[in-house]
Amino acid sequence: MKAKPLLAALILAAAPAFAAETYTVDKVHSNAQFTIRHLMSKVTGKFTDVEGAIQVDRAKPEASAVEFKIKTASIDTANKQRDDHLRSPDFFDAANNPEITFKSTKMKATGKDSYQVSGTLTIRGVAKEITVPVTLLGEMKDPWGNERVGFEVQTTLNRKDYNILWNKTLDAGGYLLGDDVAVNLTLEAVKKKEEAAK
């Protein structure tokens, strides 16, 4: 009769080893880059203020989750006049829409270090369900003993889907800006201290 309580105690003792681990996005080493066509060339920029959390479930990867937000005012294309325009109501309307957010709803492993992540992306108050490929860049301890993990997302978004419509018609035909935006999101995250100590 004592076997059942003992078994239950062993299961409870082992549970933390299989619990999801929380990693906090390192803002200093994470960014969201984008590229869009401008006339016959391309403009590349980035958002420098990215924060969020990643729940890593090693026993059941499909139960892992990610949530992050990007401050729209942190946009940087190395040109102040252009950045101010991008923050204006013509584009991201940063004053009224200070954040771009994403919250995952489903995750599926597609390879050794690759995943498909589905979730809700909200830009300018417009929420869309999207699925993006995610690559695990690696895991390691930094020189200070912190456990870190890195992920990369590469995808393409149509800005019109999020009500970013501003453009200029060219005399020769066509438009000043393209609609498709190539996105490269790099996240480096560090395990929460209390979990790293377990």
Predicted stretch roles:
Residues 1-18:
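Gram-negative bacterial Sec-dependent N-terminal signal peptides
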Residues 19-198:
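Low-complexity, acidic/polar, glycine-enriched regions of mature
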